[in-house]
A protein has these predicted regions:
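Short secondary-structure boundary/capping segments
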Residues: 8, 36, 58-60, 100-105, ...
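Hydrophobic/aromatic anchor residues within beta-strands of the central parallel beta-sheet
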Residues: 19, 61, 84, 121-124, ...
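Conserved residues in the N-terminal Rossmann fold of short-chain dehydrogenase/reductase
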Residues: 20-21, 63, 154, 217
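Conserved sequence/active-site signature of Rossmann-fold short-chain dehydrogenase/reductase
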Residues: 25, 92, 129-131
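Strand-loop microenvironment adjacent to phosphate/nucleotide-handling motifs in alpha/beta enzyme folds
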Residues: 108-325
Length: 325
């Protein structure tokens, strides 16, 4: 907050900026702020976003991400906000971790709220934002600078990437296009192999992979899946005026059902002494598309191995075919 405020004041000295410290979990504080300033637009970006940390502290993901989003969405409705944009993630699609499941629940919260409010609620799904805090590129650069190793969790792991200008553009375009209930998705091109990204960054530094800088495969972390997705199978895509921004057609979940799931989670997090198995069971009730990473990754690896066998067999058959004279 301190650095953001300094930067904004330096760039826009005539802009009226109010920096306010608070938590989305503190509804009374939120109501005081909304009551005083009556925001016309709300961009809701507050969230715990790191997958491994939320696997260790799953109840915090529910409290901050889900219940915090409900609090802000309620205040936007109560105090007459015109438009509310939720920052979501591709990890919300068929989630394999608590963080992704919590963000999918956030999408459901704002879509349910949109059905009963004059405020227009929409969401944008981000991929990995290049150069942002906690992203893989600054980490790799730091590891290269320190002489390695560069750590990659799996040789086949891929991710969708977007630049900071693309991310900002997606949010602003979503704000102008939103009519209420949409989930906006950016065409980010083909997913990038993280291993290939590590190799490229080492070479761009004038060094040789596995000669000057070793690449270490560390193993998938809890909740981490090999491939991210932009859409659930039930969602379709609609075009917008922008040729790289699309709208995922919303799934029709009754608002009453979503509210019931939120209250179930709210009641569940009142006590802390839950096992991980109990937590995942409740999260699966709230987010039926949640599948544990180990199960998802096993299916992907098996499918890939089957494809490789088929390709090898086809090549062998091709080699055995009689050559034309």
């Amino acid at each position: 907050m301190y650095n953001i405020e300094l930067e904004l004041r330096a760039k826009y000295p005539n802009l009226n900026i109010k920096g306010i410290i608070g938590s989305v979990r503190d509804k009374k504080k939120l109501e005081d702020v909304f009551s005083k300033y009556k925001p016309y637009l709300v961009f809701h970006a507050a969230a715990h976003k790191h997958v491994p940390l939320m696997e260790v502290s799953p109840l915090e993901a529910i409290k901050n991400n889900v219940l915090g989003t409900q609090n802000v969405a309620d205040c936007a409705d109560k105090f007459g906000t015109k438009r509310f944009i939720l920052i979501s993630t591709d990890k919300a699609v068929n989630p394999t971790n608590i963080m992704g499941a919590s963000k999918r629940m956030c999408e459901m919260v704002i879509q349910a709220k949109n059905k009963t409010s004059k405020t227009e609620y929409a969401a944008v799904r981000f991929g990995n934002v290049l150069g942002s805090n906690g992203s893989v590129v600054p980490l790799f650069k730091k590891q290269i600078k320190e002489g390695g190793p560069v750590t990659v969790t799996h040789k086949d792991i891929t991710r969708f990437f977007m630049t900071i200008p693309e991310a900002v553009g997606l949010v602003l375009q979503a704000m102008t296009y939103a009519k209420g209930g949409e989930v906006f998705v950016l065409d980010m091109g083909e997913p990038v192999k993280i291993y290939d990204l590590a190799v490229s960054l080492i070479k761009l530094s004038g060094l040789q992979p596995d000669i000057d800088i070793p690449i270490e495969i560390t193993g998938l972390r809890p909740g981490e899946k090999l491939y991210e997705e932009l859409l659930m199978s039930e969602e379709g895509l609609e075009h917008t005026k922008h040729n790289k921004i699309f709208v995922a057609e919303p799934l029709d979940i009754p608002a009453e059902e979503v509210n019931k799931r939120v209250e179930m989670l709210r009641e569940f997090v009142q006590t802390e002494n839950h096992t991980m198995e109990e937590i995942k069971k409740v999260v699966k009730k709230a987010v039926p598309t949640f599948v544990e990473a180990e199960e998802k990754n096993k299916k992907i690896i098996n499918y890939k191995q089957e494809l490789e066998k088929i390709e090898a067999r086809q090549m062998q058959e091709h080699e055995l075919m009689p050559k034309e004279a």
